[in-house]
């Protein structure tokens, strides 16, 4: 049974409900609420759901607020551990490189340094948005919250991402879900070198990069602008002292490993060594040393000290040059073009020394002055002892000149050379007196003699220069033609 108090409670409640329904600005059940001017924040902005659009003041309708909400919506539920298109399609990463500086190149370590802007572009359906701007520049901090390619450099020994004053990274998001990710890198990459043609050698230093974990069934790489324009080198980007950058060749490779097949992007930078330094430092000194060694062929064969100095000095000089030429090279097990040149020059210098030894050995008994052989040609005539005089004469007369005889020291016949020849044109007998016996000897015929020139020297004066000239002609012609062929091959590629 309903009491009076309960009846009054129900009547009061019904009355309040009727009063609320009659008041303006209220809606009954089934009626739509009238939109007020300040209620726009509750609508979808750029695809935002009402739960991501909290109430804000009426004056906060600028782009910053709009894109803040866009980013909040995009990252809500985004899993950066999963690549775009997982399970549906292969993710394509487009790349291009702008080289700001190339070099230096280390021959001993067989590596080079390159500074680049490395750009990557890919599409992520999860990051599509609709807003007042088509391209949204983002801070580099957002890169850690989204999926990015796990690109690494296959032949990189050391890579540095620049962080001064902030990380040198750029991230842009297009409204269709395309991302551009750029970073500045300094890469120390390996450059295999074949030094057989050193210092006229040409090298192709590679730069290889690709995905570390994703096979070609998951992630593939391609060049953004094609093979001809995707790698660009700044005009003032060369930092090479000993090389010329001839050009670069862009390509793509597939490598196979135990974990699958991977796409590898390749760029080969072709370098040509500058030979000027080595011409001044090695080639010219070697050539001058060989020429100096051949000067000894024009010296008298009796000039033993002079010719010995020429030979020994030039051999030691070539030894020093050969050692110094190897200091700037890695310790390779094969001979380079410079090694062959130095070896041939060393052979010429050493041959010149051997030539002098040969000439000296076979001609040492036929030296110049014929007067030294006079004692063998003298006709000794023993005369009857002269009548003794009161005083034995201790002097003898040679062509009107009186010389004292030292009986204690001159026990043998003295050698008479051209310096003691008579100035008279006639041949006058010379009388040699002694206390007991008088000898009469005929003077040698006055014939002026000269130092004879060895036939070996005469032949060497012609053979050595001609052979050395032919060697230089063949040597330089071979490597100059090879350089032209290599440059033509690079242009075709």
From Swiss-Prot:
Pfam families xrefs: Neur_chan_LBD (PF02931), Neur_chan_memb (PF02932)
InterPro entries according to UniProt: GABAA/Glycine_rcpt, GABAAa_rcpt, GABBAa3_rcpt, Gabra-1-6_TM, Neur_chan_lig-bd, Neur_chan_lig-bd_sf, Neur_channel, Neuro-gated_channel_TM_sf
GO biological process: auditory behavior; chemical synaptic transmission; chloride transmembrane transport; gamma-aminobutyric acid signaling pathway; inhibitory synapse assembly; response to lead ion; synaptic transmission, GABAergic
Localization: Postsynaptic cell membrane; Cell membrane
Ranges per topology, Extracellular: 29-276
Entry keyword annotation includes Signal: yes
Tissue specificity: Expressed in most brain regions. Expressed in lungs, in alveolar epithelium.
Signal peptide: 1-28
UniProt topological domain (Cytoplasmic) ranges: 360-458
Gene3D superfamilies listed in its UniProt record: Neurotransmitter-gated ion-channel ligand-binding domain, Neurotransmitter-gated ion-channel transmembrane domain
Keyword Signal included in the entry's annotation: yes
UniProt biased composition (Basic and acidic residues): 31-42
UniProt: 4-aminobutanoate binding residues: 119, 182
Chain positions found as Phosphoserine: 427, 434, 443
Family statement drawn from the similarity comment of this UniProt entry: Belongs to the ligand-gated ion channel (TC 1.A.9) family. Gamma-aminobutyric acid receptor (TC 1.A.9.5) subfamily. GABRA3 sub-subfamily.
Biological role: Alpha subunit of the heteropentameric ligand-gated chloride channel gated by gamma-aminobutyric acid (GABA), a major inhibitory neurotransmitter in the brain. GABA-gated chloride channels, also named GABA(A) receptors (GABAAR), consist of five subunits arranged around a central pore and contain GABA active binding site(s) located at the alpha and beta subunit interface(s). When activated by GABA, GABAARs selectively allow the flow of chloride anions across the cell membrane down their electrochemical gradient.
Name of protein: Gamma-aminobutyric acid receptor subunit alpha-3
